[in-house]
Amino acid sequence: RSTLQNSYDDDDVLWWGYEADLASRIALLQCAEVFVLPSLVEGLSLALLEAMASGCACVATDAGADGEVLAGGAGIVMSTLGVTSQLRTLLPVLRDQPVLTQELGRQARRRVLDRYTISRNIDALEQLYGDLMRRAPLAA
């Protein structure tokens, strides 16, 4: 983080860090144009899903499931190798191409609403259980 902060020490980039308060976090995400998650180790990031739901253009590494969540145009996926150099290339592009940034934000929001809401996940889990019950005979 400090290397990137030194490269982008101006008003174009706000280095916020962790925000525990949910209302503040939502307000920040709704104002943000880009959300960056440069994790080297990750599962499925709730912060990434929150940013996507807020309509931020999202950039994350392919650590854990984050790359899968952003695949297919819902965001930009980076390798966990050479994150700093990748961000040095990507951040100016996202800053200078507002149409691209806005479209990535729209695609991110669409993806999270299509696949990652609680009701969608409950429906999918119920479907899975139903499929399993129809296939497997019950033991006596």
Where would I find each of the regions flagged by the language model?
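Nucleotide-activated donor-binding/catalytic signature segment of Leloir-type glycosyltransferases, i.e.
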Residues: 1-20
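Short alpha-helical segment that forms part of, or immediately flanks, the ligand-binding pocket
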Residues: 26, 45, 49-53, 67-68
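Short alpha-helical donor nucleotide-sugar binding micro-motif in glycosyltransferases
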Residues: 27-32
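Aromatic "clamp/platform" in nucleotide-sugar-dependent glycosyltransferases that forms part
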Residues: 40
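Short hydrophobic beta-strand element within catalytic cores of glycosyltransferases
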Residues: 57-60
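A short, well-ordered alpha-helix in the C-terminal region of glycosyltransferases
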Residues: 100-115, 121-127
